[in-house]
């Protein structure tokens, strides 16, 4: 959430920075609500001060010998009661305006970092680096073709169980998924991450804190009878792990690695990636999350991205890093790197991780502060996939395919899977 002080002191900056995202925002209504709230706060404060003075006058009169039931004392007490009633009315009006202002502010995305490249769409994203040699070949198959021949997952039966865009992993497919999850969590634990297994049902406050609500409600699955949603990413529960808390500066940075199933409606993706593991309603992911000091967030962003890249390099998967332009960044992000893995069967790079620094945007929405010296201030949050499991499996299948129909697995994964190759079942 954006800082209300910025709205008051420099609304032009908000308009300018949101314009870099391609948004035209009229802040007039927001400014009016904010001014009304400040005016009410001033009125309430003045009335409370007057009420305090009235109370002191009553005390001085009685101390000076006036009877508690004298007309003068009664008049002052009646005045004090009227002031209390007026203050109560103003407090309710103030709460209503606060709620209105918060509702409006929650709908605005984060301001992009000054370092984020300008642009309108993914076509303006900037390639930062490449790693590995992309495999080329006319006869290379896509992962869903390989998986079908190897018997790694069921699609048609999954539609019967649920609906389209669900799969059931079978045999070596299920074992490979489990191996990848364990491998990733173990690798991240060596880099100082604390492993977390959070709830996958989260409440509205958690989704609001991370930035999914109110804007993206239609993209999430909601329980009909409770204020609970299936989490679209572990970023949501990890953000709220320290909601409404003050953390000692000595504890920072806090680094978490969490495996969760993730659930997304994928609204607007009709007809795209209808086969295989790329775009599903339910998928598994290992998420990396940092709470850090504001002065360390740029350094933390680079390290978080390197930690996600370390998984790809250990699995010998060629990839590239892109820096997203201002028009293509996510709602909560101030700056983002996307990692795209090479899929030789498809002949293209596909996103497998998005690593973002959110500044104090999520911390303000979730009231997460740190204590340094005598005061407290908002910390910074960062998140990134480390990695999406299904897309990693797709990349392993396409990059490891052999002429005999088997799949060669990378050496780092063999201790977890138990074999060097996948062969037709």
UniProtKB/Swiss-Prot annotation:
Domain notes per entry: Consists of two distinct domains, a catalytic core and a N-terminal extension that is involved in tRNA binding.
Gene name of the encoded protein: serS
Protein name: Serine--tRNA ligase
Subunit structure: Homodimer. The tRNA molecule binds across the dimer.
Catalyses which reaction(s): tRNA(Ser) + L-serine + ATP = L-seryl-tRNA(Ser) + AMP + diphosphate + H(+); tRNA(Sec) + L-serine + ATP = L-seryl-tRNA(Sec) + AMP + diphosphate + H(+)
InterPro entries: aa-tRNA-synt_IIb, aa-tRNA-synth_II, aa-tRNA-synth_II/BPL/LPL, Ser-tRNA-ligase_type_1, Ser-tRNA-synth_1_N, SerRS_1_N_sf, SerRS_core, tRNA-bd_arm
Basic and acidic residues biased stretches: 117-134
Catalytic class of the enzyme: ligase
GO biological process: selenocysteine biosynthetic process; seryl-tRNA aminoacylation
Cellular component per GO, a single term: cytoplasm
Pfam families for this protein: Seryl_tRNA_N, tRNA-synt_2b
Pathway note: Aminoacyl-tRNA biosynthesis; selenocysteinyl-tRNA(Sec) biosynthesis; L-seryl-tRNA(Sec) from L-serine and tRNA(Sec): step 1/1
Localisation per UniProt entry: Cytoplasm
Binding positions for ATP per the UniProt entry: 264-266, 351-354
Annotated spans, Disordered: 110-134
Gene Ontology molecular functions: ATP binding; serine-tRNA ligase activity
């Amino acid at each position: 959430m954006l800082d209300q002080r910025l709205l008051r002191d420099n609304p032009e900056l908000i308009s300018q920075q949101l314009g870099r995202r391609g948004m035209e925002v009229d802040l007039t209504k927001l400014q009016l609500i904010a001014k009304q709230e400040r005016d009410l706060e001033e009125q309430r404060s003045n009335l409370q001060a007057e009420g305090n003075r009235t109370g002191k006058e009553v005390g001085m009169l009685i101390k000076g010998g006036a009877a508690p039931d004298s007309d003068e004392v009664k008049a002052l007490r009646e005045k004090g009661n009227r002031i209390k009633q007026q203050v109560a009315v103003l407090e309710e009006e103030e709460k209503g305006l606060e709620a209105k202002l918060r509702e409006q502010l929650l709908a605005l995305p984060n301001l992009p970092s000054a370092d984020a490249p300008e642009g309108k769409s993914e076509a303006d994203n900037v390639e930062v680096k490449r790693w590995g040699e992309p495999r080329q070949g006319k006869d290379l198959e896509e992962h869903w073709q390989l998986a079908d021949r190897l018997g790694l997952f069921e699609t048609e039966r999954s539609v019967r169980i649920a609906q389209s865009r669900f799969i059931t992993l079978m045999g070596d497919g299920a074992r490979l998924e489990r191996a990848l999850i364990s491998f990733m969590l173990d690798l991240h634990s060596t880099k100082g991450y604390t492993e977390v297994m959070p709830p996958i049902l989260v409440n509205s406050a958690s989704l609001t804190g991370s930035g999914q609500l109110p804007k993206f409600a239609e993209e999430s699955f909601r329980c009909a009878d409770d204020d609970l949603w299936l989490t679209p990413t572990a970023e949501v529960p990890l953000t709220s792990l320290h909601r409404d808390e003050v953390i000692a500066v000595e504890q920072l940075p806090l680094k978490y690695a969490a495996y969760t199933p993730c659930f997304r409606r994928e609204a607007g993706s009709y007809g795209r990636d209808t086969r295989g593991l790329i775009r599903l309603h339910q998928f598994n992911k290992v998420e990396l999350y940092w709470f850090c000091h504001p002065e360390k967030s740029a350094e933390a962003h680079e390290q978080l991205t390197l930690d996600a890249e370390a998984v790809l390099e250990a699995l010998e998967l060629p990839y590239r890093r892109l820096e997203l332009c201002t028009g293509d960044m996510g709602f909560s992000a101030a700056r983002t790197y996307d990692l795209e893995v090479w899929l030789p069967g498809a002949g293209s790079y596909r996103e497998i991780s998005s690593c973002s620094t959110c500044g104090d945007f999520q911390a303000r929405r979730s009231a997460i502060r740190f204590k340094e010296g005598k005061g407290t201030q908002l910390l910074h949050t960062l998140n990134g996939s480390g990695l999406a499991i299904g897309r990693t499996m797709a990349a392993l299948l396409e990059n490891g395919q052999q002429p005999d129909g088997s799949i060669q697995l990378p050496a780092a994964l063999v201790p977890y899977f138990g074999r060097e190759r996948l062969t037709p079942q």
